[in-house]
Amino acid sequence: MTETAVQPQGLLRRAMDSMQLPKSRTKCFFLFLLSVFFTYAGFHHLFVPDFYVSIMPPWVPWHLELVYLSGVFEVMGGVGVLIPRFRAMAGTGLVALLIAVYPANLHMAFNPHLFPDIPLTALYVRLALQFLAFYWAYTV
């Protein structure tokens, strides 16, 4: 009687198949990149909140609490896009999150004197890149 050894690459293949990843390597790459980007950003909000608190418009209440909340949602969305059952919901949630944080980006662009360490061009480019991020999250 021969014993069948479990092949690690077989386990990995089954795990990857269960994730129902896109067939295109390019789409798969961008899905993982989206996940890493938002998961990293979320943990950054949670562990280094001072910068994010500083960019919030003064009219928004509960600065620290909302920074933590956005960090949690970023991590959830970043992980969620990798789980087929939650992928569409996570993408929609990330779009909602991006819309919710857009006022902070506008605040920075309209008040560059408050952020002298960040070049004005970067503040405006960030506004434009946000629309690319909307599309990216929406199309998962």
Model-flagged regions — what are they?
Residues 2-140:
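Membrane-interface extramembranous regions
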